Swiss-Prot record:
Its main location: secreted. Abundantly expressed by teratocytes, which are extra-embryonic cells released by parasitoid wasps into their hosts during larval eclosion. Disulfide bonds join C22-C37, C29-C41, C36-C51. This is Teratocyte protein CftICK-I. It comes from Cotesia flavipes. This endoparasitoid wasp peptide has immununosuppressive, antimicrobial and insecticidal activities. Suppress cellular immunity which is detectable as a reduction of hemocyte encapsulation in the host. Shows potent antifungal activity against C.albicans (MIC~0.25 ug/ml). In vivo, ingestion of this peptide (probably at excessive doses) increases larval mortality and reduces leaf consumption of D.saccharalis, a permissive host for C.flavipes. Negative results: does not influence host total hemocyte count. Does not influence hemocyte spread index in the host. Has no effect on humoral immune system, since it does not influence the activities of prophenoloxidase and phenoloxidase in the hemolymph of larval Diatraea saccharalis. Non-toxic to human cells, Gram-positive or -negative bacteria. In vivo, ingestion of this peptide does not impact larval mortality of the lepidopteran species S.frugiperda, a non- permissive host for C.flavipes.
Length: 52
């Protein structure tokens, strides 16, 4: 039971880490941020970019 609980926590952390590797569409992004999940980082104005 103890090992199962540890395994479950490891899986959750792995999923969270993978989820943070990309930015959802319509969210702010930059050249140093993770890549967009779908599409590219598109400039909206001078200092504002969103994933499109």
């Amino acid at each position: 039971m103890y090992k199962l609980c540890i395994l479950f926590l490891v899986v959750i952390f792995a999923v969270m880490a993978i989820a943070k590797e990309c930015i959802p569409s319509n969210q702010q992004c930059s050249t140093i941020s993770p890549p967009c999940c779908s599409g590219n980082c598109v400039l909206q104005g001078k200092h504002f970019s969103i994933c499109a």
